[in-house]
Amino acid sequence: MASNTSRSAHLAQIITENTANIETYRREQGLPPLSLGPDAPLDVKYPPNVEKCRRAVIDATLELGELATGPVELRLVPGWAIMTMFGVTQFICDFDIARQIPLAGDISYEDLSKAINVAVPVLRQVLRAGMPYHMFYESRPGHVAHTATTKVMASESLISDWTSLYTDVLFPASAGLSKALREEPTASDPSKTGFMVTKGDGESGMYMYFEKHPEEARRFAGVMEAFQKDEAYAVRHLTDSWPSDSQTGKLVDLGGSTGAVAFALAEKFPGLEIVVQDLPGALEAAHVREGKNVSFMPHDFFNEQPVKDADVYMFRWILHNWPDGHVQRILRALVPSLKPGAKVIVFDEIMPPAGTLPLSIERYQRNIDFGMLTLFNSKIRDIVEWKEIITQSDQRFNVTGVRYPENSRLSLIEIVWQP
């Protein structure tokens, strides 16, 4: 491995060259220089070649900053930063600070204090703690205004929902993980997750908890909606990679909600007859569309599958939410209904081998994986784990193919029932 000095110089060069490419593109497009100031564009989408430069800058900056910080400070400083950012962010969410401050202009600490009923000295102390992390800034003495990162919380409801979710759900779940693992060392029970031991009241899992807490359920649904809008989770990745020999016949979409995926498949493959199954509450907003061969059926996928002899049974972005034992129960519930040669298609996340991704993407994937553990006692499985859990469910399940659509976070696992 190269010395830290040569590695540092190399990283600095990556940052310089790729930042120049990004700034050149922005100038050519009439965009301002990179900034988190109040007038900065909130969400710039780059073409693939420029996005590659952006990702290179992010990864090199992360690594170079940590090399310069050193091992001791890396263990001491982030804890303070995480504590501060969490506390300030929770304060911003709980008191709806982002919406109290005008999108254009500023507000005095005195007026903000009256609006939220928090004393000026304390209000100033909390907000100033967040300012080094780009949360608001003092536009003039005694006044506070938005940065781009707080403006988006006021103007984009999905961002606001996500921010509230990680202060009210994700952080408490993480804090409860150790306690949960002392109670359930195998992390196999959805009722004994970090989230459930921290916030639960005897429910069998997080979704049952949400049934009693509709506002938290609404925020969670909003965040899932935001994920679905991300290009990396676009439905077209599934339709484009759909097996050519499964474009006609009967398809059962388990956990298909209101049928967005089913209708996309029906549009592209009119020879499919699709049955969407989900719990009754999830189907309340579902509507049959004229001319589309899609129907809806209430069903709990832990129970025996009522649709017999379908050609394909599909789980899109479902099984990662469940511990291994529960995934096996879900798959075994299909068995009495499967005909020889029937397919099960799993379209879900597959964790790449450790250390093979760029640093920022590796951290993102591991963050999601850790979140699955703290919320559901589940995981983002690698392909070996997927194959093991499938064949352990029943040896007659045969994994016949795996497809990794370009630019998709979800991959397609094709399983054939061979009794």
Curated annotation (Swiss-Prot):
Enzyme class: transferase
Family named by the database record: Belongs to the class I-like SAM-binding methyltransferase superfamily. Cation-independent O-methyltransferase family.
UniProt keyword list: Methyltransferase, S-adenosyl-L-methionine, Transferase
Role: O-methyltransferase; part of the gene cluster that mediates the biosynthesis of griseofulvin, an important antifungal drug that has been in use for a long time for treating dermatophyte infections. The first step of the pathway is the formation of the heptaketide backbone by gsfA which is initiated by priming with acetyl-CoA, followed by sequential condensations of 6 malonyl-CoA units. The resulting benzophenone can undergo a spontaneous dehydration to form norlichexanthone.
EC number: 2.1.1.-
Species of the source: Penicillium aethiopicum
Listed pathway(s): Secondary metabolite biosynthesis; terpenoid biosynthesis
Record note on biotechnological use: Griseofulvin is a spirocyclic fungal natural product used in treatment of fungal dermatophytes.
CDD domains linked: AdoMet_MTases (cd02440)
Annotated Gene3D superfamilies: Vaccinia Virus protein VP39 (3.40.50.150), Winged helix-like DNA-binding domain superfamily/Winged helix DNA-binding domain (1.10.10.10)
Entry-linked PROSITE patterns: SAM_OMT_II
Source species, domain of life: Eukaryota
Residues involved in S-adenosyl-L-methionine binding: G255, G256, D278, D300, F301, R316
UniProt-listed InterPro entries: COMT-like (IPR016461), O_MeTrfase_dom (IPR001077), SAM-dependent_MTases_sf (IPR029063), WH-like_DNA-bd_sf (IPR036388), WH_DNA-bd_sf (IPR036390)
One GO biological process term: terpenoid biosynthetic process
Catalytic center residues: H320 (proton acceptor)
GO molecular function, one term: O-methyltransferase activity
Name the record gives this protein: O-methyltransferase gsfB
SUPFAM superfamilies given in the database record: S-adenosyl-L-methionine-dependent methyltransferases (SSF53335), Winged helix' DNA-binding domain (SSF46785)
Effects seen without this gene: Impairs the production of griseofulvin, but accumulates the intermediates norlichexanthone, griseophenone E, griseophenone F and desmethyl-dehydrogriseofulvin B.
Catalytic activity field: 2-(2,4-dihydroxy-6-oxidobenzoyl)-5-hydroxy-3-methylbenzenolate + S-adenosyl-L-methionine = griseophenone D + S-adenosyl-L-homocysteine + H(+)
Pfam families, per database record: Methyltransf_2
